């Protein structure tokens, strides 16, 4: 099985509803999975999340903490903010970013270029990093895969930030 990173844009009101009643988020996922025509509120970045996280933070696995600044890239996929920490939506619980955190992260990633990311791309070091997902022998061609999904991520965050939306992330 592969661990696929999924992102879902939601309104501030939906965020508050899911925090108050986590089962509503499970219902949302059921509807999302049953729909054959997902709209632009849903993004699947496949297995690129580990490599993207490495390029952004220098770490194979980073997660947020309450002490992090609002725009910390450590929390881009794993904010450690849960509707219900015991709710398993695939590979663990869903994490969420508040609209303020989304805006802060957007400001940090919006101007990153291919050259910026390429400067942090070290296939040899990435291949040796045991916690980096997926575990593979990274090479120069793999950068294109990461950059393709990073561009989709940039656009997704830009839309969410411009609309004052929250983002939910989860592995399936």
Please tell me what each predicted stretch does.
Residues 1-148, 152-155, 159:
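Acidic (Asp/Glu-rich) sequence patches and key acidic residues
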Residues 169:
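A short glycine-rich, hydrophobically flanked beta-strand micro-motif that places a catalytic Asp/Glu
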